[in-house]
Amino acid sequence: MASRLTLICLPHAGGSASFYRSWAALLPPEVELLGVRYPGREDRFEDPMIDSMGRLVTALADALVPLLDGPYALFGHSMGSAVAWELAHELDHRGAPGPRRLFASGRAAPGTAVTGELHRQGDDTLCAELQRLGGTSREVLDDPGLRSLILGMVRNDYRLIETYRPAHRPPLHCPIHVLTGITDPELGEERIRDRAAGWADLTTARTEVRTFPGDHFYLTPQRREVVATVLRRMDPSLTTGGRTWPSTP
């Protein structure tokens, strides 16, 4: 392989860079993991949260453009999939190199995903939604301090994704790989492939749909197989290994 690859990972609503921390141990030295940390969480807790897709993508592009000195791929989960798609277009608009591949996990294509108004609902409704999707333990939601902290981030991000209306854009030119859990309640088991396949209209290159056992957060128990799949698509010569990981400011 001629140069090192960077895997840029964008989290789900309420998530942050640490969601991908465990991936570092599965990556070979040829791949650098760059976890995106949205403002208002972890060591960016003092930074104001952003509840607009346009402003978030602008801020991410500002941080990432100086770092794009080689081939890279974008991986987004749930809300992060839409952020990754918008980010690819914003980077192209700035004349930056485009991603080698885009991995869209756990979300229908922009413009086809079902939106709602959960960000306007009470805390109990938001907690019920988090339990429905999985990925958040009952113990965390039962702790008043942790619950308040998490719901603040979740409500902000739900406002972002529920008010997001993608503009009509030309297709990307990189392959799009769609990954999803076979029982993901966000997509619906009976129509999961049809909804995931909507990404095919957003690129001139090929699109692949890959399903895994599990629900919306399938990629936690299926972490090893997900990472192996990503590596094979990035470069067939890559195998799992391990290294440390940085994250964006």
Please give the residue ranges for each predicted region:
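Domain-scale detector for complete catalytic domains at protein termini or as standalone homologs
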Residues: 1-75, 82-249
